[in-house]
Swiss-Prot record, chain A:
Its EC number is 2.3.2.23. GO terms for biological process: centrosome cycle; centrosome separation; DNA repair; endocytic recycling; heart development; negative regulation of apoptotic process; negative regulation of DNA damage response, signal transduction by p53 class mediator; negative regulation of ERK1 and ERK2 cascade. This is Ubiquitin-conjugating enzyme E2-17 kDa. The gene is Ubc6. PROSITE patterns: UBC_1 (PS00183), UBC_2 (PS50127). The active site is at C88 (glycyl thioester intermediate). It comes from Drosophila melanogaster (Fruit fly). It catalyses: S-ubiquitinyl-[E1 ubiquitin-activating enzyme]-L-cysteine + [E2 ubiquitin-conjugating enzyme]-L-cysteine = [E1 ubiquitin-activating enzyme]-L-cysteine + S-ubiquitinyl-[E2 ubiquitin-conjugating enzyme]-L-cysteine. GO terms for cellular component: cytoplasm; HULC complex; nucleus.
Length: 151, 262
């Protein structure tokens, strides 16, 4: 059955194919349009460069009125990424707008990689290193970039 | 410190899950928009409360019926849309004018910087709803009103109407940012306010939302405030000030419902 959420997800997918933003990609899983797989490539000139980070996006029938649940599957060492891959990002929580689509979600997460917000940490070690020991932070990030090739 | 250790657990998702359970409880027990009920039904809610009982008695001299909306944070927008469309069903000229304004609103929002791709989706549905309540002739009015009631209780349509009105409100705040900035408390910028308090669904409306929406659509709204304030009269406020109301709402702290004047 076509519901507003499913209809909208078909549109999101079409747009992502026709007008793909640089450095991100995503598609519904084979048998369920409510669950997507996505990849974000680490932005240039950041310690995440060259990484290929996999994510899952889970939508409910309330999309786009409510945000989907987005989670990194690849291990990501980042101040705003929880140990289980969950992401602490305002537009996925209290600043969600129904005008955001999958493309906007992925590009926002991509810029979060470049610009962490250490003041609302999901990973306190990463936040602390980011603020106090940038060299060690970058080393830990690069380790997860290498890991992302194997995953 | 313990709090640092707990930090790494994914609290956001737990909070969201809990919120969703509460919302589900509300949505299972109340329709998005109820049928017309006698205003006196409010009395039961305030049984034994003198101030409210007196105010309800005063209010019932002016209004006969109330129509409840689901208390989900979208009540102002849903009540406004329902009530205004219900008025338009009885006024073909105003209906035709509103249809033109609604049709043109999309381009305006795109000009203001809203993403046209996602906007289109909401606008199409909004126009669908407007077309479904086209007043054909006065004999058919009741039928069209039933259609309105059906549409507004279909979550998909009903919520998209709310989203679109939120976007119109947000657009108006942006367009006249210098003016609306005065209404915002604290250090919020208009930009932050729009993204945090206007565009997200389920965020409650304040005066500033009402003024911006009414001004953008050129629709007068009268709100009757039923609260513990002084006196035995319910205070009314018209938005925008001095306008002739087409939509009548009752506000009780945290919630809007629709009123029907005598």
């Amino acid at each position: 059955m076509s519901t507003p959420a499913r209809r909208r997800l078909m549109r999101d997918f079409k747009r992502l194919q026709e007008d793909p933003p640089t450095g991100v990609s995503g598609a519904p899983t084979d048998n369920n349009i409510m669950i997507w797989n996505a990849v974000i490539f680490g932005p240039h000139d950041t310690p995440f460069e060259d990484g290929t980070f996999k994510l899952t996006i889970e939508f409910t029938e309330e999309y786009p009125n409510k945000p989907p649940t987005v989670r990194f599957v690849s291990k990501v060492f980042h101040p705003n990424v929880y140990a289980d891959g969950g992401i602490c990002l305002d537009i996925l929580q209290n600043r969600w707008s129904p005008t955001y689509d999958v493309s906007a979600i992925l590009t926002s997460i991509q810029s979060l990689l470049s610009d962490p917000n250490p003041n609302s940490p999901a990973n306190s070690t990463a936040a602390q290193l980011y603020k106090e020991n940038r060299r060690e932070y970058e080393k830990r990030v690069k380790a997860c970039v290498e890991q992302s090739f194997i995953d | 410190m313990e709090s640092v250790g707990n930090n790494d657990a994914n609290r956001d998702e737990l909070i969201i899950q809990q919120q969703r359970e509460i919302e589900k409880e509300i949505s299972d027990s109340t329709p998005l928009v109820s049928g017309q009920l006698p205003l006196t039904c409010l009395r039961e809610e305030y049984n034994g409360d003198e101030i409210f009982t007196e105010k309800i008695r005063e209010l019932s001299k002016k209004y006969k019926f109330i129509r409840r909306t689901r208390p989900d944070g979208n009540c102002f927008f849903r009540a406004f849309a329902y009530s205004y469309l219900e008025y338009l069903i009885t006024n073909n000229t105003a209906y035709q004018e509103f249809k033109i304004l609604a049709e043109a609103s999309k381009d305006k929002l795109v000009q203001l910087g809203f993403p046209s791709f996602t906007l289109e989706d909401f606008h199409e549905t909004f126009m669908d709803v407007i077309k479904r309540v086209n007043p054909t002739n006065s004999e058919e009015n009741e039928k069209v009103k039933n259609e309105l009631h059906t549409v507004f209780n279909e979550q998909g349509y009903s919520d998209y109407v709310v989203v679109y009105l939120r976007l119109i409100t947000s657009g108006k705040l942006q367009e006249d940012a210098d003016f609306y900035q005065n209404f915002i408390e604290g250090d919020f910028s208009i930009e932050e306010f729009r993204h945090q308090e206007v565009e997200p669904m389920y965020k409650e409306s304040d005066h500033i939302h009402i003024i911006a929406l009414c001004t953008a659509l050129g629709v007068g709204v009268r709100v009757e405030y039923l609260d513990r304030g002084e006196g035995d009269q319910v205070k009314a406020h018209d938005f925008p000030e001095g306008s002739e109301p087409k939509v009548y709402l009752i506000y009780r702290p945290g919630h809007y419902d629709i009123l029907y004047p005598n």
